[in-house]
């Protein structure tokens, strides 16, 4: 909580944590700890809960315990369907959904399902987080890998859903990603 408060005091507007009852990723917090952090930054910060879980009942239970403002779905995109995301939204009407869109590193756009994912998840997503997926990985992001930034542009131009770009960004390449 102390670190999260420090971020808010320095001007941060969003606090995100990976959380859940079943530990799936390094650094993942349990629901109780996530709730403590989220309560510690209210009402100053938007609270983002990241999950790689794919079972909506498990996700719902975790949501009830931690109560983020935004749910960042970062697991295998084919593991939770748009209909299941819609069900989550009906269970938690105030919840915003940030759907991770996987862009395969080193793979041309026409050989990926990216644009189909955008079309399929657009009706149930409040934000897209465009991130690099290692070709052999199940989850999306946290690889340090970059991808073709022209794909980011294609996605942004194809949707009205606000997009956040990610994927190996650092001081040497963030300007290129923005332009």
Give the label of every model feature segment.
Residues 1-179:
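Conserved N-terminal beta1-alpha1 strand-loop-helix module at the mouth
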